[in-house]
Amino acid sequence: MTVTSGFSQYVENACLNWFRGTTFPAVPANLYLALFTTAPVNGVDSAAVEVSGGSYARKSFVPNTTNFGAPSGAAPASSILGANQVFITPTGSWGTVAGWAMYDASSAGNMLAYGIFTPVAVGSGDTVEFLSGNLTLSVA
């Protein structure tokens, strides 16, 4: 699966505000992957439609060096998901999933990064996972 990603306006604004002398937000205790039937656009989730029903919940994981590798490369520098992230098994249809986002909370919260991928229908009993190495965050 090819995953296209970007950083949210929240993260972009935090970076720019850091240059103004403001404190960068603290690292959250957990990060949360969310799935969307209508993907976030331009780092804003106002038009996005997050999956609901069928036992859906955001997938939590700890931000650490196991789950994300150190940035590497140049133009763009990137950090690659280093551990599989498996969502709870759906008990009903999640619809056609076309995007993802990473948040700092299990519901609502601040979007940190987002992306799109080839849409896939997710039904009851399907396995939904991001495999190690298949999600890359890049800074150009």
Task: Indicate residue ranges for each PLM-predicted region.
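Small cysteine-rich, disulfide-bonded extracellular modules of the LU/uPAR three-finger superfamily
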Residues: 1-100, 104-140
